[in-house]
Amino acid sequence: MGKTPLLREDGRCQRNTFGGSKASSKGSSSSSSNNTVSSKKKPRRKADALMFIQIFIHLLKSNIGTGFLGLPLAVKNAGLLVGPVSLLAIGALTVHCMDILLNCACHLTSRLQRSFVNYEETTMYSLETCPSPWLRTHSVWGRYVVSFLLIVTQLGFCSVYFMFMADNLQQIVEEAHFTSNVCQPRQSLVMTSILDTRFYMLTILPFLILLVLVQNPQVLSIFSTLATITTLSSLALIFEYLIQIPHHSHLPLVASWKTFLLFFGTAIFTFEGVGMVLPLKSQMKSPQQFPAVLYLGMSFVIFLYICLGTLGYMKFGADTQASITLNLPNCWLYQSVKLMYSVGIFFTYALQFHVPAEIIVPYVVSRASENWALFIDLTVRAALVCLTCFSAVLIPRLDLVISLVGSVSSSALALIIPPLLEIATFYSENISCTTIAKDIMISILGLLGCVLGTYQALYEMTQQSRFPMLNSTNVHT
């Protein structure tokens, strides 16, 4: 992985060793807590700065969401051997690209003597320094493209959260009269749903609207802590179940290339935290500690990804569902696991929603009178939540939406853009040919995954629309 720029004790860039370039140590030690389109940044108040453990919790929750529980199906789509190996490779590339993004942002803050630059501004300022006159002239479009991708990705995450919570809530409610105290492996029995999944989405909607109106970082940290407690508790019970019963044997080591494309979309979707890296660093009380948080947190995350994906597929085999919680036994213990994880996802919604809200809301509010600012702020936030709910209602297929969002926008933000930014940022500072070749290869890999994965996900959706599923739910005894 590339070297992260060394930081002074005050959090400023001291030295940049990536690609043979050097950065000035000039810059302000304060950072903005907002990831907005505006180029003017307010200094971060010490009272709002977050500690090491708080940032670690935010990072953990940003990457352990609904896509995490879809990894057993992803491994099924790739194969028992290819799946875990590919997860490790994609994870390493993603963390490396996060490191590149941090490196470019830190270098630009020193060069421009800015306190903080977000992902969008990093893209714009990188293009302003690249050798192409056309790109320098149109550098502002780089900011617009990244802003659009961030909005699509994060709102896509939020739509998936709606589907996940609705699917699990439906199963909990409609299986209540089948639920027992004895936890036995499920035996599939298809029953007609009492209520459509969309009804449960609409039930959740008003509570999420109230949740996103909370904007204080300290309060969001409390929500994230609650989400982490419930999520880790439920994950402990899930892992306990996965290892206690004999697994399926003779599972394919390598799956079809068509289903592997769905694996790519799901895998890259699962690394949900790329949009949160720069905002989290800006909110940290001691920014020089952020590289340690990043590597420690992401190493733990990748380890969990591989374990859950492999064990889940080995456990349920061909019956693996879009979310592993839907495979759990129909007993009160594991029904509580679904409820706990859904509560964790509920609070994580606010964390993922923060990124698009901080891009869109200030832009809209700045065009209104000051008397209407608060009303418009709250209205836009509520409208965005309704938009994610509406998207989930239109395409209530958890696995395909995860793969589509991952292929379309997550791959661009996580794999395609950061390597290109490194070339643009350091090209005039004697970046090595090896680094350029490496960056081009990563971007091409991300582009291939984006195009082919998007095609396969859309193809599966069209097949699904031609042969729609019955309005039924899997009830297991």
UniProtKB/Swiss-Prot annotation:
Q: Which GO terms describe its cellular component?
A: vacuolar membrane
Cytoplasmic-side positions: 1-54, 99-144, 224-225, 281-291, 366-374, 421-439
- Residue ranges crossing the lipid bilayer per the database entry: 55-75, 78-98, 145-165, 203-223, 226-246, 260-280, 292-312, 345-365, 375-395, 400-420, 440-460
Report whether Transmembrane shows up as a keyword of the record: yes
Q: Which Pfam families match?
A: Aa_trans
Q: Where is the composition biased (Basic and acidic residues)?
A: 1-13
Gene Ontology annotations of biological process type: glycine transport; L-alanine transport; proline transmembrane transport; proton transmembrane transport
Q: Does the keyword DNA repair apply?
A: no
Enumerate the subcellular locations listed in this protein's record, separating them with semicolons: Membrane
Ordered alphabetically, the record's keywords are: Membrane, Transmembrane, Transmembrane helix
Taxonomically, the superkingdom here is Eukaryota
Q: Which residues lie on this side of the membrane: Extracellular?
A: 76-77, 166-202, 247-259, 313-344, 396-399, 461-477
Membership in a protein family: Belongs to the amino acid/polyamine transporter 2 family.
Task: Output this protein's name.
Answer: Proton-coupled amino acid transporter 3
Taxonomic lineage: Eukaryota, Metazoa, Chordata, Craniata, Vertebrata
